[in-house]
Amino acid sequence: ITQVGLNFSRPAAQILGQYYQFIRLGFQGYKEVQQNSMAVADYLHAEIGKMAPFQNYSKDVVNPLFIWYLKPDYAKSAKWTLYDLQDKLKQSGWMVPAYTLPENLENWVVMRIVVRQGFSRDMADQLLGDISNAITDLEKLEYPTPTRIAQDRQQAVKGSVFTHTGCPKSTK
C-alpha cells in the first residue's frame, strides 16, 4: 500500500480522537484519567449534597455525571428556581444546565454536572464557590424571580438557550 487515507464525517473525528488518546495514554493512563474524573465527580456530588437547598437525585455516582434538585421544603419558600441559578452560574462562565426530566417526571427541575477530562479539583472548588455565591445572591432577593412566579402558576418554564455565538438560535 502506497497511500492510506481516512474519510470520516465529523462524529467519526471524535471517535478517532478517542482511539488516539487510548493509544497515546495506554490502558493504565486512560484508566487514571477516568478515575480522576470520577474522583472529582464524587467530590462535587458530596459537596453539593451538603448545601442546604439541594438534594442529590441519586445516592451514588456511577459515571462522571450527576443531577440534583431543590429540596421540596426549601423550594416552597425560595424566591428563585434552578433556572435562576443556571443564569447566575452562566455569568461566572459555567455551563450547568437546568431542565425538566422526561415524561412522567416533568415536574422535576434538575441541574446536571458532567465532569470532563481535565476538570481538576481546583476547578471543582471554584465551581462550588460560585454556586455558593450565587445562592447567597439569590437568597437576598426581595421578590420572586419571573421563573419562580411562572413555576408557581404552573406555567411552562424553560432555561435560557446557550449558543457559542451569544445570539439566540434561529428558528428559520
Which ranges hold each PLM region?
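Catalytic-loop motifs flanking and including active-site residues across diverse enzymes
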Residues: 10-17, 62
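Non-catalytic terminal extensions of PLP-dependent enzymes
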Residues: 26-172
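A short glycine-threonine-serine/GTX helix/turn-capping micro-motif
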Residues: 1-10
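Short glycine/serine- and small hydrophobic-enriched flexible loop segments
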Residues: 20-24
